[in-house]
Amino acid sequence: MSEHWPIATLGDLCERITKGSSPNWQGFRYVDEPGILFVTSENVGENQMLFSKPKFVEDAFNEKDSRSILKRGDVLTNLVGASIGRTAIYDRDDIANINQAVGILRCYPDRVFNRFLAYLLNSPVFKELLHENEVNNARANLSLTFFKNLEIPLPPLPEQQRIVGVLDEAFACLATAQANAEKNLQNARALFESHLQSVFTQRGKGWVEKKLSDVCAITSVLIDPRKEEFLDLTHVGAGNIESQTGGFINLKTAREEGLISGKFLFDESMVLYSKIRPYLMKVARPDFNGLCSADMYPLAPTSNEITRDYLFHLLLSKSFTIYAIQGSARAGMPKVNREHLFEFKHWLPGVKKQKQLASNLDELHSETQRLESLYQQKQAALAALKKSLLHQAFMGRL
């Protein structure tokens, strides 16, 4: 923090520091709108209020807990749980109250600018300080006494307002950059999904309708992963496959995992399909030999009937996923049984056409993955820039 700014406690800067209570403890019910808007820690984002799922309580709650009735401009900070220290300003005119997980910091407007305080409490330095002072009982929490005694650097009001103005402008530019990156990624995903569906809903000349059982099979048998010959083979479970992408994560050998129950052998010619929770769309093309969980189907494509790449994309298609989900729903269990899997019917082109279509899908998928990677990099860079700006602001360097 800047050495040139005086220090003040929040107890001296706020006319009220308090928190709410639980309606259930007070004998009140949650109600449908209209009622008293009831703010919980879920509604307090970082520098923004989140009301996609608002809650309401009986009007009489405000008579019982009048101390925590909100006013426009109140600084709200989360006192409990994973979002501890997350701070935003209540920017609505709705009559509202809060629960025990949210604290009110009602500033004296002639002493501290509420938006300056919100930015300060959301800064990396103060987030770290708040976490250092958590009291870990059943859930991490911060006390009102801690906030009353919390010392903050306090530049003159005009300087506070200037700093907020600079941060507002900078953060607006960052939000625009983030929105543009997200839009580019959404467009790429939409293009891939559109092309994927167009491939698997068309029926060209010479295409033949076939069941999955006509074009692939499960040829593997269960083996004991404790045997020496299998111990150093890589194991793939549903948790090791990324949804919709087919990427592998956190792979280990049978020895490293200490596997006991039976597993299927697979090789590089197969497609792995997770039969558990088909809506997750976990399908993969391994480029190695290994073992897979009994909750997966190692599918061997039939030569001259279907290519491995075409089978991979077919199992990721919307039509197959809907079919798989419907089958698991009828069975009353979130998994696809073998009989239902192989009964799936689809119009298939010749192998040459399959190779062409699968190649096009792979190219689009690679481009989508590239944009996904760029998006993640940009997100990380923007987050780092935000932290840097907040740090510079409260060091007096803006």
Can you name each region flagged by the protein language model?
Residues M1-S21, N149-G165, A172, T176, ...:
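Non-catalytic DNA-recognition/assembly elements of restriction-modification systems
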Residues V44-F56, V75-N99, R115, Y119, ...:
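Short, ligand-facing micro-motifs at secondary-structure edges
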Residues R111-R115, E305-D309, K355:
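Short, conserved charged micro-motifs
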Residues G27-I36, Q48-V57, R67-L70, A88-Q100, ...:
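Short, surface-exposed loop/turn microsegments at beta-strand edges and helix-strand junctions
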Residues G11-G27, E42-R72, S213-P225, V236-E268:
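Sequence-specific dsDNA recognition surfaces
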Residues E3, R29, L79-V80, I95-G103, ...:
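A short glycine-rich beta-alpha junction/loop motif
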